């Protein structure tokens, strides 16, 4: 049985001369996480199940949906590098004409009847258009629903960075307070021992405050 590419609108078939044309076919990964990323990248919906399409054993994607850098060509048999994700797919708008033409052609072939009965042809055309419209609506809804998830992920990332910054600032302030307290204690002891005058003690105290403030600003910026 000839294998066909599972991507929407792709007519690539695994034929004996495919490799001569530079076309290779690759089964879906056994790693569930990577396979899930493949499926999401395809943006293919299962109209009958009203959900995301799931690959079956033996389903493949052709090399047209991968970048040149995704392949390992060091061995005689070209293979994909570990963990790569397909990224080259036609958009739904671009596929609209192709998909309608393919579905209609398939339905007309299956429903071919004598030329005297035109009603069957009209039914076939109507069903193929309805099938395409349903598929297009599901694909459009899927792409729209994906946006809030991405926004939520970005929001969580920003909130996490903000919390980390707050925690870092608190640590800096606590450290500088301890340092300032230690310096003032030393200045007070020097003054009590009459090793420095009151004027010098006041200057050192002011200098200590200015240095601490500057240090806090530098730590916060960095």
From Swiss-Prot:
SUPFAM superfamilies per the UniProt record, alphabetical: Glucocorticoid receptor-like (DNA-binding domain)
PROSITE patterns registered for this protein in UniProt: ZF_THAP
Residue ranges annotated as motif HCFC1-binding motif (HBM): 139-142
Coiled coil location: 149-194
Any one GO CC term of the record: microtubule cytoskeleton
Pfam families the UniProt entry points to: THAP
GO MF assignments: DNA binding; zinc ion binding
PANTHER family in UniProt: THAP DOMAIN-CONTAINING PROTEIN 6
Protein name: THAP domain-containing protein 6
Species: Homo sapiens
Gene that this sequence comes from: THAP6
């Amino acid at each position: 049985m000839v294998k066909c590419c599972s991507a929407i609108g792709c007519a690539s078939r695994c034929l004996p001369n495919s490799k001569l044309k530079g076309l290779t076919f690759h089964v879906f990964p056994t790693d569930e996480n990577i396979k899930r990323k493949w499926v999401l990248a395809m943006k293919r919906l299962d109209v009958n199940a009203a959900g995301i399409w799931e690959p079956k054993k033996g389903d493949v994607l052709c090399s047209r949906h991968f970048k040149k850098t995704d392949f390992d060509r060091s061995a005689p048999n070209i293979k994909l590098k570990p963990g790569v994700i397909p990224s080259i797919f036609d958009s739904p708008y671009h596929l609209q004409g192709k998909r309608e033409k393919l579905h209609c052609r398939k339905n007309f072939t299956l429903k071919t009847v004598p030329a005297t009965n035109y009603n069957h042809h009209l039914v076939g055309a109507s069903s193929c258009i309805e099938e395409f419209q349903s598929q297009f609506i599901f694909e459009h809804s899927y792409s729209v629903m994906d946006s809030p998830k991405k926004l939520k992920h970005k929001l969580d990332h920003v909130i996490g960075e903000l919390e980390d910054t707050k925690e870092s600032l608190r640590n800096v302030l606590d450290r500088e307070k301890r340092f300032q307290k230690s310096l003032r204690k030393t200045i007070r002891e020097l003054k009590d021992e009459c090793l420095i005058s009151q004027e010098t003690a006041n200057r050192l105290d002011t200098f200590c405050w200015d240095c601490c403030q500057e240090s806090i600003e530098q730590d916060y910026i960095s």
